[in-house]
A protein has these predicted regions:
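Extended hydrophobic leader/signal-anchor segments used for secretion and membrane insertion
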Residues: 1-154
Length: 154
């Protein structure tokens, strides 16, 4: 006796449905990536895999975020939120890298923007060095919720 199309398709419904659900979650809710540099060491090691949450409340100081800058995903820590003052004279700089000259040494973070730093001040290309030192809320892709093994050795 021949099986109908419905009977033949039935065993595939659950696996296909689960695959679709996982795909939707990974594309719209979660972000899986890796730490591309040593800028967040010792907190996050270069090559570690990370899990970010795309849907979250407003970032706050201390949050580790994944942001997009010039088409590249970066992992940084929020150092100042909208309205917070940033005293540039108190920040640690790497002397080999030219620092943009701002007219003021104390900047106020504009509304809808953030000032970000890497935990490894000696090896981080972050708000201290960017011509436009602030990251807009739209540039923030996800908030870090977990990191996984440092599987890629240098």
């Amino acid at each position: 006796m021949r099986k109908s199309i419905r009977q033949r398709a039935k065993p595939w419904c659950v696996p296909l449905g689960l695959t679709l659900l996982i795909y939707i979650l990974l594309r719209s809710v979660f972000l899986i990536g890796y730490v591309p540099s040593a800028s967040m060491e010792p907190t996050l090691h270069e090559g570690s895999f990370i899990l970010g949450l795309r849907l979250y409340s407003e970032p706050k100081v201390g949050d580790i975020i994944i942001l997009e800058k010039d088409g590249v995903l970066l992992v940084k820590r929020i150092a100042a939120c909208p309205g917070d003052p940033v005293d540039l004279s108190q920040l640690e700089y790497v002397t080999a890298i030219p620092i943009p000259v701002w007219e003021e040494t104390v900047l106020t973070v504009p509304e809808g923007c953030y000032f970000v730093l890497g935990d490894n001040a000696q090896n981080s290309w972050d708000s201290r060095y960017w011509a436009q030192p602030f990251v807009s809320r739209q540039q923030i892709v996800a908030k870090l919720i977990n990191s996984f093994c440092h599987c890629l050795d240098k």
